[in-house]
Amino acid sequence: ILLISLTTLQSCNDDTDDGLPYGGPVEPATNTIVDIASGAENLSILVSALEKSDLISTLSGQGPFTVLAPSNEAFNTFLNDNGFNNLEDVPVDILTNILLNHVVGGRLASTDLTTGYATTFAISSASPASMSIFIDITNGVKFNGVSSVSTADISADNGIVHLVDAVIELPDVVTFAVADPTFSTLVAALTRDDLTTDFVGVLSTATGTSPAPFTVFAPTNDAFGSLLSELSIAGLADIDEPTLDAVLKNHVVAGANVFDTDLTDNLTVSTLGGDITANVTGGATLTDSSGRVSDIIATNIQANNGIIHAINKVILP
């Protein structure tokens, strides 16, 4: 169910006697998102899931909401892939958060969507923050690299519905690295088959199990391109395994979900590869042991087991 930032509705008139917005009762939505789902045969499992998770009243509210609605086939695939015989086997807390991972505040028509990140109503287990969702519109519309829009722009009085062909499970930091083409070189580095460290396995660890949660300072493709020029080499294959392993560890903080607001000037940040220094005056930066400075260019991409900040220069040991 969808993306973007959760908004808080506030009264526009503090002087009203009844405390309701605009000085009077709000007319209930008459053709809600729930009404639309209830009237669609291929969304019957979604409706049952909303009932089990006690989200019917939420999505019958004023909104507006954007809902990514998985089809019955999508739900059946999700249940089979995760070893559940039926919807009743899914723990309520998990099901609720997965459903909220398909909901974004606001009415986002397909023409409003752009490639990038938005914020869902799902809450990360690594922090009190709502989780991000990655939208890619380069070839249709896809969410987190796994779920595509099959039918768009079904309008409701309290928002809009897009039917999707797969349940969007709760993302980990690897999910976003793989889904976002900005990090394709990073993914190629993390998955090089000669590495001693299984970075994908480590960074897929769920919160509650060491060494999660994680903070990942993720170099963009351009950052890796600049590194190759700096080192006068042709590609990642020219970096020996011990060096690449050490470089990648320098971008991972284990055991902490560090927001950009947690960074301060001259803050020592301990990564798996050693200490780096954060500064925030004039813009957030990271300085490695050689004095090389990397700018943090995108912040707070929140996953279920940690957080990602994009950087414009690779951090060296």
Please place each PLM-identified region on the residue numbering:
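Sec-dependent N-terminal signal peptides
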Residues: I1-S5
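Mature, structured domains of secreted/extracytosolic soluble proteins
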Residues: L6, C12-P317
